[in-house]
Amino acid sequence: MSKKIIYFLCTGNSCRSQMAEGFGKHYLSDEWEVYSAGMEAHGLNPNAVKAMNEVGIDISDQTSDLIHIDLLNNADFVVTLCGDAADKCPLTPAHVKREHWGFDDPAKAEGTKEERWMVFQRVRDEIGARIKKFAETGE
């Protein structure tokens, strides 16, 4: 039996969707092929890599990719992680389940270096908890 496809989308495929892909591969890889992409490709944010390393998940080999229409149309589940992606994401066929799980953009955090870093950690933990919940309950 082939695995289902889950596709995490955000604006730049730099932070949130990259962390979601990492957590998805960690929690969901037995049943799901996990991908991420963005409306634009801003490159992998080094703080996203650092934040994920703190929880033992290496995303340093992931790439920042634009949405691939064929993958979008063949996915079983598409998850938008920011309002911009939810608004601008191309239409998906009726058979593709689509949900919005909104998270703050850690790359836009303000304050001291430590305060900005705490936002990366918080968003990472929120994304991880949401994907773990999905892995455990299917919701």
From Swiss-Prot:
InterPro entries: Arsenate_reductase_ArsC (IPR014064), Ptyr_pPase (IPR023485), Ptyr_pPase_sf (IPR036196). This is Arsenate reductase. Its EC number is 1.20.4.4. Belongs to the low molecular weight phosphotyrosine protein phosphatase family. Thioredoxin-coupled ArsC subfamily. One of its GO terms (cellular component) is cytoplasm. It catalyses: arsenate + [thioredoxin]-dithiol + H(+) = arsenite + [thioredoxin]-disulfide + H2O. Its main location: cytoplasm. The active site is at C10 (nucleophile), C82 (nucleophile), C89 (nucleophile). It comes from Shouchella clausii (strain KSM-K16) (Alkalihalobacillus clausii). The keyword Transferase does not apply. It is found in: Cytoplasm. Catalyzes the reduction of arsenate [As(V)] to arsenite [As(III)]. GO terms for biological process: response to arsenic-containing substance. Disulfide bonds join C10-C82, C82-C89. GO terms for molecular function: arsenate reductase (thioredoxin) activity; protein tyrosine phosphatase activity. Keywords: Arsenical resistance, Cytoplasm, Disulfide bond, Oxidoreductase, Redox-active center.
